[in-house]
């Protein structure tokens, strides 16, 4: 007895089924050595487009945003440092 799934045949050939394979059947993998494909040279000329100049408005916005993020991070660190400054740091000696 057993479940029906265990009685179903395995979809891939087993060792025993491989022995039963007829000589006329082609193997799954060719016996030739698989070589990597080499890219064929292409004589297509592509125009290299220069990226548009950086917009000063975007640079100023990015700088201001990074300054705001840095300021908020420092303020958060200072608040946590004040809150937990009296708790000693214990370095673990174990792994």
From Swiss-Prot:
Any one GO CC term of the record: plasma membrane
Lipidation (N-myristoyl glycine): 2
Pfam families tied to this protein: SmAKAP
Modification note: May be palmitoylated at Cys-3.
InterPro entries with a match to the protein in the record: Small_membr_AKAP
Lipid moiety-binding residues (S-palmitoyl cysteine): 3
Single GO molecular function: protein kinase A regulatory subunit binding
Presence of the UniProt keyword Repressor in the record: no
Region (PKA-RI-binding): 56-74
Subcellular location: Cell membrane
Residues bearing PTM Phosphoserine: 40, 92
Alphabetized UniProt keyword annotations: Cell membrane, Lipoprotein, Membrane, Myristate, Palmitate, Phosphoprotein
Known tissue expression: Expressed in heart (at protein level).
Main location: membrane
Annotated function: Binds to type I regulatory subunits of protein kinase A (PKA-RI) and may anchor/target them to the plasma membrane.
Subunit and interaction comment: Interacts with PRKAR1A and PRKAR1B.
Alphabetized PANTHER family for the sequence: SMALL MEMBRANE A-KINASE ANCHOR PROTEIN
Family note: Belongs to the small membrane AKAP family.
Protein name from the UniProt record: Small membrane A-kinase anchor protein
């Amino acid at each position: 007895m057993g479940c029906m799934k265990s009685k179903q045949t395995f979809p891939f050939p087993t060792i025993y089924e491989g022995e039963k394979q007829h000589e006329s059947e082609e193997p799954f993998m060719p016996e030739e050595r698989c070589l990597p494909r080499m890219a064929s040279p292409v004589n297509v000329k592509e125009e290299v487009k220069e990226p548009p100049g950086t917009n000063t408005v975007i640079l100023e916005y990015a700088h201001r945003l990074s300054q705001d993020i840095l300021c908020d991070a420092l303020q958060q660190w200072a608040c946590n440092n004040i809150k937990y400054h009296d708790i000693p740091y214990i370095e673990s000696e174990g792994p």
